A protein has these predicted regions:
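AlphaC helix of the eukaryotic protein kinase fold
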Residues: 79-101
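C-terminal lobe helix-coil module of Hanks-type protein kinase domains
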Residues: 65, 160, 220-325
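Activation segment signature within eukaryotic-like protein kinase domains
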Residues: 151-152
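Activation segment of protein kinases
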Residues: 83-86, 181-226
């Protein structure tokens, strides 16, 4: 691991701590249910299942190969406990329906929703060979401006595409962004926003709205907007807020809201007082601090109205940083 001046050692950064938790979960090994032990099996007489790539509260993710064409894929299988919950199954079906409409180089779409004869429900997605943004942050520390801003702009473009289709991500975090090799991309990579598992259409019919009205706040506490914490309706500005927190961590290795646990960080967000970017890294442009501050405004009305607006402001902030460096020279 490489230490970067002015940034905490990777294992002490917020991304590093989350990575340790994720790695510990994988080391626990498979549980007793079939969904957690599919490695080296043939799923639905079509997919050769390889190693387990990860797990979450709702699913297990595996590397797989489609035996009909040899394509390498990622398959997300719903946990048995949740598949017995009709609302969870409906949520997954909605996820597939929404994400199948996505078609953009900076988002990962879902190819197929399937169900085996014995009731395992799964999603088939392209396998992205690359590095999670969270792992890059652990390995390299804070990203330089000339890499971080272009990657954020790519994320904005992918999310704008989703928002144009009335889809809100609702769970943006570094663990849901893959950096895939791309000769034309900044630093030879391209950012792909993944896991629209909590995605939600903005304009819902009453019966659809009931599917997500479970009384449980969904999302990742460190990155949720104040309105998401309160269980209020979400719109593109909620994703703007979450992406701004992702950006803050990218450039500093720290989160803008502090607390001893997730609950305290959520309370801090409801009070609307994030750390200032340049309190953590003084060499970053003042304009970038202003842009992220606006994106993290407590009131959604004070944020950028769209990802397009956020992207344009980020590009302007990067230019201001370049000119400032030239002026200092």
């Amino acid at each position: 691991m490489v230490e970067v001046a002015g940034v905490s050692p990777p294992e002490q950064t917020s991304a590093g701590l989350r990575t340790l938790v994720r790695q510990a979960a994988l080391k626990r090994g498979p549980g007793m249910d079939r969904a957690s032990a599919l490695t080296n099996s043939l799923l639905d007489e079509r997919y050769e299942v390889g190693k387990r790539l990860g797990e979450g509260g709702m699913s297990y993710v595996y590397l797989a190969k489609d035996v009909t064409n040899g394509e390498t894929l990622a398959i997300k299988v719903l946990t048995p406990k949740l598949k017995e919950d009709k609302s969870s199954v409906e949520r997954l079906r909605r996820e597939a329906g929404l994400a199948m409409r996505l078609d953009h180089p900076n988002v990962c779409r879902i190819l197929r929703l399937g169900e085996t004869e014995d009731g395992l429900i799964y999603l088939v997605m392209p396998y992205l060979a690359g590095e999670l943004l969270s792992d890059r942050e652990v390995r390299q520390g804070a990203l330089p401006l000339d890499l971080g801003v272009p990657l954020l702009v790519q994320m904005c473009r992918g999310l704008q595409h989703a928002h144009d289709l009335q889809i809100i991500h609702r769970d943006l975090k570094p663990e849901n962004v893959m950096l895939v090799p791309d000769d034309k991309g900044p630093g030879g990579v391209r950012a792909v926003v993944m896991d629209f598992g909590l995605a939600k259409e903005r304009r819902q019919e009453p019966e659809v709205a009931k599917l997500t009205a479970t009384g449980i706040v969904l999302g990742t506490p460190e990155f949720m907007s104040p309105e998401q914490i309160r269980g209020k309706p979400l719109d593109p500005r909620s994703d703007v807020y979450a992406l701004a927190i992702v950006a803050f961590e990218m450039f500093t290795g720290q989160l803008p809201f502090q607390g001893r646990n997730a609950q305290e960080m959520m309370i801090a967000r409801l009070r609307g007082k994030p750390k200032l970017l340049r309190e953590v890294k003084t060499d970053l442009p003042a304009r970038l601090e202003s842009v992220l501050g606006k994106a993290m405004a407590l009131d959604p009305a004070d944020r950028f109205a769209s990802m397009q607006g956020f992207a344009e402001a980020l590009e302007g902030a990067e230019e201001s940083g370049v000119f400032a460096k030239l002026f200092r020279k």
